């Protein structure tokens, strides 16, 4: 972790996590990205700003690839900030983002830049499942019994569906970070 750079801006190889999220959302057809930020972390939104002076300087020095990298985030998606005044958890953050939705928007994806799912393309598959079946779609993976205390654990039943190569299960219940028994 870091004390000076928000974790959302930490690079995964050479691209900040928040930019990877924006890229995947845009690739799935999203028009806007509501970024939930704490009052002291609004600088995260600067990443989606325009830096024409820096780009021009890089181009003048023959660094076109770097200039393109600087411009990339600004052209991916419209990013809007939503402030979460108190850190009251992920559910509260999602509720805060509701204010950014337009009346005709009925689908929301919760994407966390510090919890990347690889390979890229999982969101495309989730969109395909929602388009086919409707409702809420969650991405889950198996963990060893010894690791369950780190995760929310689902009780599932077979939905007898496979969409876009993905096994679809129906969630019956969930326990957040259970003790190993």
Regions of interest found by a model, annotated:
Residues 109, 127-131, 159-181:
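Catalytic-core segments of class I nucleotidyltransferases/pyrophosphorylases
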Residues 1-60, 65, 84, 122-124, ...:
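N-terminal glycine-rich phosphate-binding loop and ensuing alpha1 helix
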Residues 17-21, 92-96, 173:
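Well-ordered alpha-helical segments embedded in enzymatic catalytic cores
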Residues 29-31, 104, 132, 170:
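Short loop/turn motifs at secondary-structure junctions
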Residues 4-7, 111, 138, 149, ...:
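Residue-level signal for pocket-adjacent positions within structured domains
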Residues 44, 54-57, 64-160:
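Conserved beta-loop-beta/alpha segment of the NTase-like Rossmann-fold superfamily
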């Amino acid at each position: 972790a870091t004390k000076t750079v928000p974790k959302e801006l930490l690079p995964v190889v050479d691209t900040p996590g928040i930019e990877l999220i924006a890229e995947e959302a845009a690739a799935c057809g999203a028009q806007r990205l509501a970024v939930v930020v704490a009052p002291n972390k609004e600088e995260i939104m600067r990443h989606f700003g325009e830096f024409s002076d820096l780009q021009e300087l890089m181009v003048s020095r023959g660094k076109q690839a770097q200039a393109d990298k600087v411009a990339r985030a600004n052209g991916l998606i419209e990013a809007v900030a939503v402030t979460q005044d108190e850190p009251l958890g992920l559910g509260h953050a999602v509720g805060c983002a509701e204010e950014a939705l337009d009346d005709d928007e009925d689908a929301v994806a919760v994407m966390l830049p510090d919890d990347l799912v690889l390979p890229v393309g999982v969101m495309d598959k989730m969109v395909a499942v929602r388009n086919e079946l409707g409702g809420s779609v969650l991405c889950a993976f198996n963990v060893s019994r010894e690791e369950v205390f780190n995760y929310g654990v689902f009780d599932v039943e077979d939905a007898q569906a496979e969409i876009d190569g993905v096994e679809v299960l129906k969630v019956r219940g969930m326990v957040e970070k259970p003790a190993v028994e």
